Design a protein with these regions (language model features):
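ASCE P-loop NTPase helicase motor core
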Residues: 143-207
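Conserved RecA-like ASCE ATPase "motif II neighborhood" in helicase/translocase motors
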Residues: 99-155
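Walker A/P-loop
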Residues: 22-42
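ATPase catalytic-site recognition across NTP-hydrolyzing enzymes
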Residues: 204-269
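Pre-P-loop entry segment of helicase/translocase ATPase cores
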Residues: 1-24, 268
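Walker A/P-loop NTP-binding motif
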Residues: 39-51
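Two-metal-ion RNase H-like nuclease active-site motif
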Residues: 107-114, 261-273
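Conserved nucleotide-state-sensing and coupling region of NTP-binding domains
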Residues: 59-115
């Protein structure tokens, strides 16, 4: 079938994980930029072929979701004839369950849901050495600071603790749908390597030009609207009503001050100490 060439950022991610057996890595990639394909399927298959992976754990927002995601790499091992031709038959009858399977060369793959206990995870003598947390945040979660805090703690304690003393590749992937989110907290942690990819790069071009044209992306933006597009495609979550949007502002060249009949300046000090108050709003009117 038709294939799409990888973008430089996708190749860089694979090489970074290949070259660093111990790393905490965050892929903050826009929707539609193959986060799951690379981190749940392509990269672990690559690491396994290089004999750099023994036990993979894939974490989703629920047990069913995680098992569905793990099913993609399981299907590749079972049916991808190119991989089988190069590395041999992978399926082992009796060790090929949904959500948990072992390949012919003794590499294990487990699925876990959000918050599900990962303690004691191992296969024979191996503890997990590749953990990927895929799209853990959702719309409901990011609106609940207490749940975000609890889940962040679970990720950094119970889940990270399944590695062998921190050794291994510990990855989290998703697009930034909330400033208060597990992904945001993960990226802010000391030592985490962050790969941030927006649908449109700083030069106004598609980040994955082999997949998307700028016309397609702009059409998405028109349909989705500014706030939704920024959230889903540009890793810029905006709370509606909390900002002044650029398209609301009308710019003009001001006259010299002597040309105005009068000027009125108003300052709103907003003495409340919450983050929603703009404590430096000043407006100048002239007529």
């Amino acid at each position: 079938g038709k294939h799409t060439d990888c973008a430089p950022f996708q190749i860089k991610a694979a090489h970074t994980l290949r070259d660093h057996p111990t790393i905490q890595y965050a892929a903050q990639w826009a929707r539609g930029h193959a986060k799951s394909v690379h981190f749940d399927v392509g990269i672990p298959m690559y690491l396994k072929a290089l004999k750099k992976l023994h036990l993979m754990v894939l974490v989703g927002k629920s047990k069913d979701n995680a098992e569905t995601l793990l099913g993609d790499i399981q299907a590749e091992f079972e049916f991808n004839q190119r991989y089988i031709s190069d590395f041999g038959v992978q399926k082992v009858t009796g060790s090929w369950e949904t959500g948990k399977f072992v390949t012919a060369d003794g590499r294990a793959f487990f699925a876990r849901g959000r918050g599900q206990s990962p303690r004691g995870l191992r296969y024979k003598k191996y503890r997990p050495d590749y953990i990927v947390i895929d799209d853990l945040d959702d719309d409901e979660l990011v609106n609940n600071p207490d749940r975000v805090a609890r889940l962040t703690k679970w990720v950094k304690e119970a889940l990270f603790g399944t590695l062998d003393g921190g050794r291994g590749r510990f990855c989290m992937v998703g697009n930034l749908i909330g400033k208060n989110s597990v992904l945001a907290n993960f990226m802010a942690s000391d030592g985490v390597v962050v790969s941030k990819v927006n649908a449109i790069d700083k030069n106004g071009k598609p980040s994955w030009a082999a997949k998307w044209t700028i016309e397609e992306i702009r059409a998405e933006e028109r349909f989705m609207g500014y706030i939704s597009f920024q959230r889903e495609k540009m890793n810029n979550p905006i709370t509606e009503g909390s900002i002044f949007r650029n398209d609301w502002i009308r710019w003009c060249r001001p006259l010299r001050l002597a040309k105005y009949d009068y000027l009125v300046c108003y300052c709103d000090p907003s003495f409340k100490s919450t983050t929603r108050n703009d404590y430096k709003a000043i407006k100048l009117w002239g007529k």
